[in-house]
């Protein structure tokens, strides 16, 4: 769930949407009250300090455990000293200065990326259980948004840990709306059922399985930490990037539409050193971005990386999804 927060009148709506989203996960009233407080303070800060921005709410299941994640993304002046801004009583807007302190107290994890002139991204996580499906040493973050005016997103992503490594899928159903969403969700279901297949057979299975749908652009990236290699197979315009030890490589996809036209299904391999960061996104984001434009961002939490790329490079005329994953 994400919603624009542009003025004080939208703070209560942001809180309502955050609580509504979290309630669907079965959380009790005490947990919902914590989420409401964090959402309120984040939305208020977006208006007071960021000149407006976006509030993003999602579930998470990774190295931190399982719970609800809230992010506030703005293009405001940014902060030169994040540590000072976290303290109760610090304010630059004539307010009591309790917002970040309240967010810190209600959150189990709080991470901020901010630079003067580059805006601010704040991630707060409320942990309500241990990690589930994913291996415990994986950090994951994602942001998705539907085509303007649509109620469903035509993109879908999935991540799973199998015998052959940690594997990420991003699928962008052709067009937008319910039929695009059906194609992307079908891809995610096939992926989850066959995640232990080698990458080329897996993508071939996806291609055949999407034939009854309108098709999709899709990509699969498998991070093999035993061999220190990323295996990548893509059909269509899903962008893939590997970052490791300061080296940035754009991964190669072949043209086509999974389910209809896929003249070549080929795996490309990319060795890495250190802790790799893999980023996949649909064409709802421009590819004209570079992490070097955000000093220090590459080492930050994947949710903040996904959030900032979404904030600054979303085209605004299509469904958009960006996912970042880092084995720890």
Task: Report each predicted region and the residues it spans.
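Catalytic core of PPM/PP2C metal-dependent serine/threonine phosphatase domains
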Residues: 179-246, 252, 265-266, 325-327
